[in-house]
Regions:
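Short amphipathic alpha-helical segments with coiled-coil-like heptad repeat character
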Residues: 107-110, 338, 515, 533, ...
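Conserved structural-core and active-site-/substrate-pathway-adjacent residues in large, well-folded domains
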Residues: 16-19, 30, 53, 99, ...
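Residue-level signal for pocket-adjacent positions within structured domains
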Residues: 1-2, 7-8, 39-40, 176, ...
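Phosphopantetheine-dependent thiolation modules in NRPS/PKS and related acyl-activating systems
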Residues: 1-78
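Left-handed beta-helix
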Residues: 168-254, 258-267, 282, 395-506, ...
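Glycine-rich hexapeptide-repeat left-handed beta-helix
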Residues: 144, 221, 227-334, 469-589, ...
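Terminal amphipathic alpha-helical/low-complexity segments used for targeting or macromolecular assembly
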Residues: 73-200, 288-447, 540-692, 781-803
Length: 803
């Protein structure tokens, strides 16, 4: 800090003006000194003077508590890394599998549409649509289950080298079971029935609300009466040092697994046990019967996370609900989707012409004019979506009484699911997020209670979700980054209840926060990234909260007040107007970019129809493949175009700085959705490279997200698990900070791990699941770090790692 000699009793943050980045560098320097004990960021926050810190690290380590995690059994020697021929062969086989499945879908679809089109009259077409829809749905649901049992049989604890032939089988099964239409029935008895069909041992009266479907289902055991809430990971596998490791996850009877949790392989919860939100069980951790744990890694607590009591929800109710869901799909949704295309072709001769032999509409320039005109209907989706959201869900919400306990799988449950589905539209939230428009969208369209709004132009980010918007309150002057999940509905295995979730005024919320309705925070709080919001104890006010379980830190530091003079007066009005103009242009670009892709897909469909008589179903299959591949190329070009004139660089500026507005444009205009289909394939590395990531050879990426691609460096042979994030920026109140992060060769990021900006991980380092590696941290080579905030938990890893 350049402060020279200071008193040993001076406060790091209050007196010396330090911040978390400075103290992370301080901790890294201390760890390099062999004559000094290791210190972590948590030690610094809890002991914010030199005297207090020295006394804390000099004290003898306390005896391990009774609930300390059980160390995992020693792993077998890791297989040797795959060579280049295996890497190339794996990618080729994955591409062939994708094309083959696309052909199967095209074959079934074209046969079905031909048969439906031969119907006479509307009713006959409808009946044929229902029959074809039923058969098609049965095939799409059954194929992944059949493939799993044929290629794998029963999953067993094992190690699978990535890019090997065994891994190709693993990838095929993982991809198919996660794209099965039955996944759409999450929160329904049909979902647990699907898990049973895949080999999972699921007890009676179990409710699963997480869309993160487990893959190695034979290794999953869930006892009677257990509830697994949304955004939880319990995949029964993980990737580590270039190897897929499968292992058991065991949940006893009447277990509660709260929102945004991670259950690593080899973890378990006993009968009646509870795991709090934003928590994780690492490999080897076992929660005894009846105990409550929370944190990352979890530790014992007295907090009760069973927020709602039971209700009558017997087998008859579950059966009727499942039957009604299937009937709705077969009698309404599928006929609309299948028969609607036939009706469209029948009523639009200019489109029907492309199916006729000989000269077709594709040779007429007016066809393309009509195609462009038809594609302009894309823009009508925005006002229609806003009108629908402002009316239908609001009317439905009147049927549900806050605070009242309702049984699952009844009328009120169905209404609540419709409200949650229709008001959480990512397209619109991303459109209005990071702009002044977001507060009007949330308040007027969705029904949020935002008190008296203090417009900043960045009140909310582009990612936000809730259970119901009508019971979501955010106080005056509060700013929210991306990834906030407002949990204002509590679920048991038989019941649910909605209640108001209130975030106080003058708060700042970081990224990836799950905020429960029982949250105990009030005015003027800083909620750090991935913090576990407390639901017990006093109301926290005027403090910051960090970690899981959370502990208090300073609400703000000197560095974050650098641009406070811009927050008021005439200067604010002038800068806010300029920001609004820039954000409006960004929103227009967002819509135009997606409209152009929509137009391109429309033309591809037309060309496929033109060539159908010549090539048959292969035309449709290749058209589907081209939609995916050309979409990737298109959005890579969009990404590069946005940053062509203004490349991403480390920043320290106000949110009213033009450089920050350009960064907001970079976050909004490109798309990342297309990346999902490339997870676990060599093609993901190619795309990262095209997007500007400095990435090494044979990196295994199972679903990592990089917010600022060109600021990230990833070394050879790294392993990036699903749900992991490398975010090269941070924002506290009105101050924006950004820097580069480096993940050296052979590193592993666990499931749900979060890496902040300015971080350097040494060769072969491991970051445990659900960990938060804070800004500026330096992880030594081959070290094992974990926790929230992360700290060193072990030395050189036992595996061979990257060679």
């Amino acid at each position: 800090m350049g402060a020279g000699q200071v008193s040993a009793d001076r406060h790091f943050f209050d007196d010396l003006g330090a911040d978390s980045l400075v103290m992370a560098h301080f901790c890294a320097r201390v760890r390099k000194r062999a004559d000094l004990p290791s210190v972590s960021m948590k030690d610094v926050y809890r002991n914010p003077t030199i005297n207090a810190l020295a006394a804390a690290v000099a004290a003898p380590a306390p005896a391990p508590p009774a609930e300390a995690p059980v160390p995992p059994p020693a792993a077998a020697a890791a297989p040797a890394p795959a060579g280049t021929p295996e890497y190339v062969l794996c990618g080729a086989l994955q591409l062939l599998a994708f094309v083959g499945y696309a052909y199967l879908i095209a074959l079934i679809s074209t046969w079905g549409y031909t048969w439906i089109a031969a119907g006479s009259g509307t009713f006959d077409v409808y009946l044929r649509s229902v029959l074809f829809g039923a058969v098609g749905l049965l095939v799409l649901c059954a194929v992944p289950i059949l493939v799993k049992w044929v290629l794998i049989g029963r999953w067993k604890p094992q190690q699978i080298r990535v890019w090997s032939l065994s891994y190709v089988r693993f990838w095929v099964v993982k991809t198919l079971v996660r794209t099965d239409p039955l996944v759409l029935f999450v929160g329904s008895p049909l979902y647990t029935l699907y898990l049973r069909a895949l080999g999972a041992k699921i007890g009676r009266d179990v409710a699963v609300f997480s869309r993160n479907l487990p893959v190695c289902t034979d290794l999953l055991t869930v006892g009677d009466g257990t509830v697994i809430r949304k955004d939880s990971f319990f995949s029964c596998y993980r990737a580590h040092a270039g190897v897929i490791q499968t292992g058991a996850v065991v949940l006893g009877k009447d277990v509660v697994v709260s929102e945004a949790t991670v259950l690593d392989i080899g973890s378990s919860l006993g009968d009646g046990a509870q795991l709090g939100h934003a928590s994780s069980l690492h490999s080897g951790q076992m929660v005894p019967d009846g105990e409550h744990w929370h944190g990352s890694p979890a530790q014992r607590t007295d907090v009760d996370y069973r927020a709602v009591g039971p209700a009558g929800c017997g087998a008859w109710r579950r059966t009727v609900h499942s039957a009604l869901q299937l009937l709705a799909v077969l009698l309404v949704y599928v006929p609309l989707a299948v028969g609607g295309v036939g009706v469209l072709l029948a009523e639009a001769p200019q489109l029907t012409a492309v199916l006729e032999p000989g000269p077709t509409a594709l040779t007429d320039w007016m066809f393309y004019v009509r195609a462009v005109a038809a594609s302009l209907l894309f823009f009508a989706a925005v006002p229609f979506g806003l009108l629908f959201q402002a009316t239908v869900p609001r009317l439905l919400s009147r049927t549900i009484t806050p605070g009242k306990v309702y049984p699952l799988y009844g009328f009120h449950y169905g209404v609540h699911r419709i409200i949650a589905l229709t008001t959480n539209r990512k397209f619109l939230t991303r459109l209005f997020g990071d702009s002044s428009g977001i507060v009007h969208y949330l308040r007027r369209c969705l029904g949020y209670d935002l008190s008296r709004v203090e417009q900043t132009g960045s009140n909310f980010g582009t990612e936000l979700k809730h259970e119901t918007p009508y019971l979501s309150s955010v106080g005056t002057g509060t700013m929210v980054a991306d990834g906030l999940s407002i949990v204002n509905a509590d679920f048991s295995n038989t019941s649910f209840r909605v209640s108001r979730a209130s975030i106080g005024p003058r708060n700042y919320l970081g990224n990836r926060i799950t905020y429960p309705s029982r949250g105990r925070t009030g005015d003027n709080c800083l909620l750090a990234t991935k913090v576990m919001v407390p639901i017990d104890g006093k109301i926290r006010e005027g403090v910051g909260l960090l970690g899981s379980p959370s502990f208090e830190i300073p609400r703000s530091v000197q560095r974050d007040s650098t641009f406070d003079e811009l927050k008021s007066g005439e200067q604010l009005g002038r800068l806010l107007s300029a920001k609004n103009r820039h954000n409006a242009a960004t929103m227009a670009l967002y819509l135009v970019v997606r409209w152009l892709y929509f137009l391109w897909v429309t033309l591809l469909v037309a060309v496929a129809a033109e060539l159908y008589d010549t090539l048959g179903a292969w035309t449709i299959a290749l058209g589907n493949v081209l939609v995916v591949l050309s979409g990737a190329v298109y959005f890579v070009l969009v990404d590069r175009a946005v940053t062509a004139l203004h490349p991403l660089t480390p920043l320290f500026c106000s949110i009213y700085d033009l450089r920050f507005w350009r960064r907001e444009r970079f976050w909004k205009v490109p798309s990342e959705s297309y990346l999902l289909i490339f997870n676990g394939t060599p093609f993901k590395n190619v795309i990262w490279r095209l997007l500007g990531v400095r990435i090494g050879r044979k990196v295994f990426d199972d679903g990592c997200y990089l917010t600022e691609r060109s600021l990230v460096t990833i070394g050879d042979g790294c392993t990036l698990n699903t749900g992991s994030v490398v975010q090269c920026h941070s924002q506290e109140d009105g101050t924006f900070k950004s820097d580069r992060s480096t993940i050296a060769s052979g590193c592993t990021l666990g499931v749900g791990a979060f890496v902040h900006y300015g971080v350097a991980m040494g060769d072969g380092a491991v970051l445990a699941p659900d960990s938060f590696l804070m800004k500026g941290e330096v992880v030594p080579p081959h070290a094992q770090w974990g926790g929230n905030p992360a700290r060193q938990t072990g030395g050189r890893d036992a595996g061979e790692g990257w060679r």
